[in-house]
Amino acid sequence: MDRKVKPDFAQYGFAHQENLIMACIGGSQAHGAKLSATDDTDWYGLYIPPPTNVLGLEREEHFVFTTGGKLGGNGPRDVDVCLYTLMKWAGLAAKGNPSALHFLFAPLEFTTHTWDHFSVRPEIFLAKGHVKPFLGFADDQMKRLLGQKGQKNVHRSELEDKHGYDTKYAMHVIRLCGEAKELMEHGRITLPRPNRDELIEIRRGKYSLAEIRELGAQLESEALAAQATSPLPDKVDRDAISRLLADAHLRFWSASGG
């Protein structure tokens, strides 16, 4: 595989550029549902900090940066960067966090042999119980869509004005439920999503709110049914993940001189 060019996150203040082990594009672009006229670019990546930042008193878990303003929503020229330490990411992935699991299946913009040891073994991070966080996040998005949770997203008020509801929340509901079903049935998450045309149509307001609720309920039911017969283990092997993490850190530090 072409290792590709390492993204320059140092320009955003990232202090461990040489410790980066993978990077990918996330968000709507990864799902295949990006609207070029409105969406920013979301960068995700993983790095292994120096030993003192893992074993010492001053531990770190992530680096975040955005070129967007705090008072206004991001535009198509803005960039969001979210980089996790390998340790933090593994903990999230082992719990079935949808965004963390995407790292295992997303097309890579940059990768290393260190990350290869994880990407070739996605199954150790997958379990039947992971349907719960996917559907939980979908339910959260539905509640926000219906105004039952959180505050109104003022940066996307034009979506409500135009379509009667926040179509981006709706897209995430359908996406997450579909990912949960595929994960239970096949032990993978296809990125970009096979139904990306449908997701774009949802974002453009081609579906009524009633249709979104009906489709979401149907996909949730199918995901739960798939969980019952899923070939995935009941839970992840945390000992195996811990051994893989320890080996990756020791090898990386040895090769880089700590």
Range-by-range predicted roles:
Residues H31-V64, V173:
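Catalytic metal-binding acidic patch
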Residues M1-S28:
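Helical scaffold of the NTase/Pol beta-like nucleotidyltransferase catalytic core
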Residues T67-A180, L191, E201:
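Conserved NTP/Mg2+-binding pocket subregion across the NTase superfamily
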Residues V131, L135-A138, M142, Q148, ...:
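Structured mid-to-C-terminal alpha-helical surface segments
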Residues E60, G69, G73, A240:
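Metal/cofactor-centered catalytic core regions of large enzymes
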Residues S28-H31, P49-T52, K181-E182, I189-T190:
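Short, solvent-exposed loop/turn segments at secondary-structure junctions
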